[in-house]
């Protein structure tokens, strides 16, 4: 069921027990989580282009909807695997896209709106239409300077 839903969203899913070292060079990353029957899911997803200075990385909202049903235990257990940078961990925020926030920001979830605004304003190449559902400026996908698939 989970695999079928993710596939309908254009996300590739594999059941895998080994750790996959992901690369951000092609704007893909991997997410590990528990499936409905406790199996480990390896989900490879395309992410928005981002700048090195930005503390936030948005992932597709469709993925957050699926993972949020796996409880917050997913976020705590898999934070190291989700992050391309050691100072970030993942947070599944109900009703919002899956986001990567700095650890200190996880203590106060009201800061997710500020983090989202920072992403949208600090790097015009970061946001993709529909990925950001929180208040803040957004940029069209075809805006000059945006190069999909490249950082």
Curated annotation (Swiss-Prot):
Subcellular location(s) per record:
Cytoplasm, Cytosol
The UniProt keyword set, sorted, is:
Cytoplasm
Principal location class? cytoplasm
Per the entry, what induces it? Answer: Induced by DNA damage.
Which protein is depicted? Protein InSETG-4
The organism encoding this protein is Homo sapiens (Human)
């Amino acid at each position: 069921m989970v695999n079928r839903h993710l596939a309908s969203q254009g996300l590739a899913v594999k059941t895998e027990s080994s750790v996959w070292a992901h690369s951000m060079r092609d704007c893909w990353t991997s997410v590990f989580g528990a499936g409905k029957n406790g199996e480990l899911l390896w989900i490879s997803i395309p992410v928005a282009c981002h700048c090195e200075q930005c503390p936030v990385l948005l992932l597709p909202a469709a993925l957050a909807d699926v993972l949020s049903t796996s409880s917050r235990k997913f976020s705590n257990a898999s934070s190291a695997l989700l992050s391309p940078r050691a100072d970030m961990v993942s947070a599944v925020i109900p009703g919002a896209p899956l986001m990567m926030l700095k650890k200190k920001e996880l203590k106060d979830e009201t800061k997710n709106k500020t983090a989202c605004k920072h992403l949208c304003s600090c790097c015009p190449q970061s946001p993709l239409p529909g990925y950001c559902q929180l208040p803040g400026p957004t940029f069209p996908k075809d805006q000059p300077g945006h190069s999909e698939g490249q950082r």
